[in-house]
Amino acid sequence: MSESNAASVRTVACLLGPTASGKTAAALALAARRPIEIVSVDSALVYRGMDIGTAKPTREERAAVPHHLIDIVDPADAYSAAGFRADALRVVAEIAARGRTPLLAGGTMLYYKALTQGLNDLPAADPDVRATLDAEAARDGWPALHARLASVDPATAARLAPNDAQRIQRALEVYLLTGRPMSALLAAPPRNDDAAAGLRFVPVALEPSDRAVLHARIAARFDAMLEAGFIDEVERLRRRDDLHLGLPSMRCVGYRQAWEYLEGVTDYRMMRDKGIFATRQLCKRQLTWLRAMPARIVVDCCAQDATARAVDALERVLDGRTPA
């Protein structure tokens, strides 16, 4: 990179990590030292009214440090990686224009990938097509639509379970709107624009040296959520007539398990066990994404001084003391 190009590129520090790795503590510790504003990279925190089960920053924390892309979507509505990318780029520019420092923080790696690498040229959702597919699924069942998908896009069908309604619907929708298999569109180079050309994203990753430590934290945090009234939170959502388990919001970790408990499908102990297991599986997927990211700066989230180490790494990024 030439000196002139380097001067025109703004470095954006990114604090990434799996569930319960200490991202919030590190971000708030950095905020005590620098004029930062936190931009959430979390697909669950976007939903209003879903506070306990998403471990949303408290009102006090959000009052102390500006947070963005939290509580921006109703649980009945959809929010996409494309929407996140547009919102995040806009917010980062607005923060910089105020003379403050944006810090991206979260664990939704698909959002981070969309932001930093661009998007594939997939069509937007079409309500009419979705309504047609929903009607067909109600009549024939999702396994029948999965078989239909296999006939037009075998690669996508092979990686989806026959009852994965959301993804089967999306893959068929893409095919019906474009005439091309979604697998072919995803294999094409991502479409990038100039919106992120002036930004250099540098990830600092909180990762465990001992997964057992992280698993213990996950269990303790889930129990704390239950003590804080998580079941009551889900019951309030369940009483709404526009929410159901097929929505992306209700598939957030913990919410499906609590909903099924309230429906009488499971007992309390099974709900707790399944909620913790689902969170551990999410953690595993997050770590898989992170470890495929070669340029990241790794901080052991199990270390006693993990917060201080993360803050030091982020400050080195912000001060330009990392390789370009």
UniProtKB/Swiss-Prot annotation:
ATP binds at residues 17-24. Substrate binds at residues 19-24. Its cofactor is Mg(2+). Keywords: ATP-binding, Magnesium, Nucleotide-binding, Transferase, tRNA processing. This is tRNA dimethylallyltransferase. Belongs to the IPP transferase family. Catalyzes the transfer of a dimethylallyl group onto the adenine at position 37 in tRNAs that read codons beginning with uridine, leading to the formation of N6-(dimethylallyl)adenosine (i(6)A). It catalyses: adenosine(37) in tRNA + dimethylallyl diphosphate = N(6)-dimethylallyladenosine(37) in tRNA + diphosphate. Its EC number is 2.5.1.75. The record marks 108, 130 as: Interaction with substrate tRNA. The gene is miaA. It comes from the Bacteria. It comes from Burkholderia thailandensis (strain ATCC 700388 / DSM 13276 / CCUG 48851 / CIP 106301 / E264). Signal peptide: none annotated. GO terms for biological process: tRNA modification.
